[in-house]
Regions:
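Protein kinase-like catalytic domain
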Residues: 63, 111, 115-119, 220, ...
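ATP-binding glycine-rich phosphate-binding loop
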Residues: 8-31
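Active-site acidic catalytic loop and adjacent metal/ATP-binding pocket
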Residues: 23-31, 37-38, 161-210
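Conserved Hanks-type protein kinase catalytic core
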Residues: 86
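Charged phosphate-binding loop/patch that engages nucleotide di/tri-phosphates or the phosphate backbone
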Residues: 17-18, 237-254
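An alpha-helical support segment within catalytic cores of ATP-dependent transferases
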Residues: 2-7, 113-179
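A conserved alpha-helical element in kinase catalytic cores
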Residues: 23, 36-83, 94-114
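Active-site Asp-x-Gly
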Residues: 48, 174-178, 190-242
């Protein structure tokens, strides 16, 4: 572990965080009375959206544009990349599902805030072409998520089938700022409904339907198809189902 990371952690006890499915490792720790997170990624992911240093750069660029974690320290060695961030306030939106809080409204507000980030000077490209290059690299390195399920998509039976299908069905993109993984575990809500966003490694310019697709899937799988449809019906634009499906398929191996 690099000296700068060791010095900041000092004698704090690292607690593993098991939430999430990425190849990154996350630990929380207390320093004084404040909560921090140490996130690391293997060096082989340095050129991908799993890169911790990429995420740190996204967070630093977003500071003042969106409520995101403060980056405290970054470092790297031959094996891993490292980032320490300060914890954001609030609780995950996932904890509010099933309560009396306005979950759909909070999802819509989260989407509005993210897509309102100006992209004219955004240096991060997360468009479909970039993500497909990333998927091809991960597939070639044997780094894809092996727990995939193609049952919903007839004619696709292997990861190679899916990659070919994705290349053949790239949608026309309406580029906005995208979180890249906008689900209920990555949106934090305070008592007065102030929103904070975490896990922005995939952040950057991308099609507006990417984040919509993730929210729709989140609601469909965790609540009901009806509630997911209600979310779509309240959008200010007509649904583009083909775009949503493309981004769900793109995420299946990641």
């Amino acid at each position: 572990m690099p000296d700068s990371i060791k010095r900041f952690i000092a004698d704090s006890v690292l607690q593993p965080d098991e939430i999430g499915e990425s190849p990154c490792e996350v630990h929380s720790f207390l320093r004084g009375n404040e909560l921090y997170f140490l996130k690391t990624s293997p060096s082989i992911y340095a050129g991908t959206t799993y890169s911790v240093l990429r995420e740190a750069a996204v967070l630093q660029w977003l500071a003042g544009r969106l409520k995101v974690p403060e980056v405290i320290v970054t470092a790297q060695d031959d094996e891993r990349e490292y980032m320490i961030t300060r914890a954001v306030p609030g609780v995950p939106l996932a904890e509010l599902i099933g309560t009396k809080r306005p979950v759909l409204e909070l999802f819509h507000e989260a989407l509005r805030q993210v897509q309102s980030v100006p992209t004219a000077d955004c240096p991060f490209d997360s468009c479909a072409a970039v993500r497909l290059q990333e998927l091809a690299f991960l597939l070639g390195q044997g780094l894809i998520d092996e727990d995939y399920d193609f049952d919903a998509w007839p004619g696709i039976s292997t990861p190679q089938d899916l990659l070919a299908h994705l290349h053949a069905t790239v949608p026309q993109e309406d580029l906005v700022f995208s979180h890249g993984d906008l689900g209920d575990s990555n949106i934090f809500v305070t008592d007065n409904d102030e929103l904070h966003f975490i896990d922005l490694g995939r952040g950057g310019r991308a099609d507006r339907w990417l984040d919509i697709a993730f929210i729709h899937r989140n609601l469909r799988e965790d609540l009901s198809a009806g509630i997911a449809a209600d979310f779509l019906s309240r959008l200010p634009v007509a649904d583009q189902a083909a775009n949503r499906i493309f981004f769900e398929q793109l995420d299946e191996l990641l």
